């Protein structure tokens, strides 16, 4: 579901990720970025620092605006905002473990007003990285 929705993004993909080790999701994001879709993300600093198969470096090397969060605690969001109209969120980390072993959930919200609220939170979290 996530990759299918990302593959159909036309204008923008914003994401906040605690754990991001999914090659499939990373490849979908990179593909859309190559096609001109705006892509920006914030990932949890502790997870990036542990670098256990994470996608941070891969995305950064693909010239995607990906940053480490700047808060003292965990940046525990698991959110995609697609075309400022669709939100994907839930317990699901963007990880191989979530795909293959864990019981996880996501909810997909098709509502521009709700997407705008998530976008405000993304912008707040992103501003703390600077």
Residue positions per predicted region:
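Short, structured motif recognition centered on aromatic/hydrophobic residues
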Residues: 14-18, 79, 118
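A post-motif C-terminal structural segment
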Residues: 60-62, 67-71, 76-78, 82-85, ...
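Generic detector of leucine side chains in alpha-helical contexts
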Residues: 5-6, 59, 74, 119, ...
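Primarily the HKD phosphodiesterase
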Residues: 2-65
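Surface-exposed beta-strand edges and their flanking turn/coil or helix-capping segments
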Residues: 2-5, 28, 54, 80-81, ...
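Solvent-exposed loop/turn segments at secondary-structure junctions
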Residues: 19-23, 45-49, 72-75, 86-87, ...
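Signature of lipid phosphatidyltransferase scaffolds
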Residues: 86-130
